C-alpha cells in the first residue's frame, strides 16, 4: 500500500528539514495493521496542515495542493453497511484519478460505483482507508478540518436526476446561488451567470424561466453550469446520460472533453458508447472490488474481459471490426470514437482510391 509522503516542493524552505524527518517516520510505518497505521500517519502529517490546534493558519499558504494538477490517490478504501462492520459495500479499493484525464467508474448495478465516488468527493467518510492528493490526506474517521472544507469547496457533484439539485424558481438564481454563497459574484450578476450558461450551451435560454420547465438535456446542462459557476476544480457526474437523446449525449461528451485540461473529471456510467467516446481511463468495479484499471481503448479491445463480465462492446467498435473483417483498414483507427469520426475516416479512405474506368 502506498504510504503518503510530504512533497517538499509545495512547502516553504524553512519547513523542509521538519518535513524530511516526518517522511522518514512515514516510510517506517507498518501498513499491515490498518487502523493504527492510519492514526499514526494522521498524527505525523496533521501538524503540517496548521501551525497549532488553536490557529487555523495553513502551513503552506495555499500551496498545500494543486487540485486540478496533482494526482488524487485513494488507498485501501473500504465502506461497511454500518458501524458494526456488517457487510462491505466496497472492499479495499486503491487507485489514482489522474489530472487532465476523464476517468469513468464502471460496473453493474450494485457494484459500489456511487459509494466509491462519494468517498472520492469527500461526501462520505470511508470505514477504512485514506485519500491523498499532494500534501493533503483525508482519513477514515478523521475530524473535519478547515483544509478539508476548502478542499470540498473545489468539488462539484452532479446527481443522476439533475432536478433533484434545483432549489430556485429561475435559471438566473439557480446558476448564481452557489457562487453567491462562496462570494464569487453578487446576487443579480447576469454577466457572470451568462458566462457559464454560454459555456454549457444554454446561451439563448430565458433567465427568468423555471428550471423544472427545461428538457432533460437542458436540466443536465443547467446543473453543470451551476456547479461550474462555483469554480470547482474536481467534477463528479453520476450517470449523466440517463434520460438524454443521442444529440444531447454527443454535446455533453464534447463539452466534458473540452473541460478536462482545467478540471479533474470523474464519471459514473454504464453507457459504453458514451464511455468510449468521452473517457480516457476506466476503473471497473465488480461486487465492490476494483478488478481493472486501464485505458478505455485497452479495456474495450480485450474481448476476454468483455465476455467474462457480459459487457457489450461499443457500437463504434463493432462497426470498425465489421469493416476490418471485410478487408477495410483505417489509417487512424485508434482515433475513431464516434459515428462522425467513422464517416470522416471512410471519406478519407475512399477519396484516396483512384477511380476505375
Swiss-Prot record:
Query: What's a single GO MF annotation on this record?
Result: ATPase-coupled transmembrane transporter activity
Can you supply one Gene Ontology CC term for this chain's record? Answer: ATP-binding cassette (ABC) transporter complex
Q: Does the keyword Nucleotide-binding apply?
A: yes
Q: Does the keyword Metal-binding apply?
A: no
Q: Which UniProt keywords apply?
A: ATP-binding, Nucleotide-binding, Transport
Domain ABC transporter, chain residue ranges per copy? 72-312
SUPFAM superfamilies found in the cross-reference section = P-loop containing nucleoside triphosphate hydrolases
Q: Which CDD domains match?
A: ABC_cobalt_CbiO_domain1
Binding of ATP, residues: 107-114
Family classification: Belongs to the ABC transporter superfamily.
Q: What name goes with this protein?
A: Putative ABC transporter ATP-binding protein MG303
Give the species.
Answer: Mycoplasma genitalium (strain ATCC 33530 / DSM 19775 / NCTC 10195 / G37)
Amino acid at each position: 500500500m502506498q504510504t503518503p509522503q510530504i512533497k517538499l516542493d509545495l512547502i516553504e524552505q524553512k519547513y523542509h528539514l521538519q518535513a524530511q524527518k516526518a517522511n522518514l517516520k512515514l516510510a517506517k510505518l507498518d501498513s499491515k495493521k490498518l487502523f493504527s497505521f492510519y492514526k499514526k500517519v494522521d498524527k505525523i502529517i496533521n501538524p503540517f496542515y496548521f501551525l497549532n490546534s488553536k490557529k487555523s493558519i495553513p502551513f503552506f499558504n495555499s500551496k498545500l495542493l494543486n487540485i486540478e494538477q496533482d494526482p488524487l490517490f485513494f488507498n485501501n478504501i473500504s465502506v461497511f453497511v454500518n458501524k458494526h462492520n456488517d457487510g462491505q459495500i466496497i472492499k479495499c479499493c486503491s487507485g489514482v484519478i489522474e489530472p487532465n484525464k476523464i476517468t469513468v467508474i464502471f460496473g453493474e448495478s450494485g457494484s459500489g460505483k456511487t459509494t466509491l465516488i462519494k468517498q472520492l468527493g469527500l461526501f462520505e467518510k470511508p470505514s477504512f482507508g485514506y485519500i491523498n492528493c499532494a500534501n493533503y490526506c483525508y482519513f477514515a474517521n478523521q475530524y473535519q478540518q478547515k483544509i478539508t472544507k476548502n478542499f470540498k469547496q473545489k468539488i462539484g457533484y452532479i446527481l443522476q436526476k439533475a432536478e433533484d439539485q434545483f432549489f430556485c424558481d429561475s435559471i438566473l438564481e439557480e446558476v448564481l446561488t452557489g457562487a453567491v454563497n462562496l462570494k464569487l459574484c453578487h446576487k443579480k450578476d447576469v454577466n457572470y451567470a451568462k458566462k457559464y450558461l454560454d459555456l454549457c450551451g444554454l446561451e439563448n435560454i430565458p433567465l427568468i424561466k423555471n428550471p423544472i420547465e427545461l428538457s432533460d438535456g437542458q436540466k443536465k446542462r443547467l446543473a453543470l453550469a451551476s456547479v461550474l459557476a462555483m469554480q470547482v476544480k474536481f467534477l463528479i457526474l453520476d450517470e449523466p446520460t440517463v434520460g438524454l437523446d443521442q444529440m444531447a449525449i454527443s454535446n455533453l461528451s464534447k463539452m466534458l472533453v473540452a473541460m478536462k485540461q482545467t478540471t479533474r473529471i470523474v464519471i459514473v456510467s454504464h453507457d459504453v458508447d458514451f464511455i468510449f467516446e468521452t473517457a480516457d481511463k476506466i476503473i471497473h468495479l465488480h461486487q465492490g472490488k476494483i478488478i481493472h484499471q486501464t485505458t478505455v481503448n485497452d479495456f474495450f479491445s480485450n474481448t476476454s474481459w468483455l465476455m467474462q463480465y457480459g459487457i457489450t462492446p461499443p457500437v463504434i467498435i463493432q462497426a470498425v471490426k465489421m469493416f476490418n473483417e471485410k478487408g477495410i483498414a483505417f489509417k487512424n483507427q485508434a482515433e475513431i470514437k464516434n459515428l462522425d469520426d467513422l464517416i470522416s475516416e471512410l471519406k478519407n479512405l475512399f477519396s484516396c482510391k483512384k477511380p476505375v474506368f
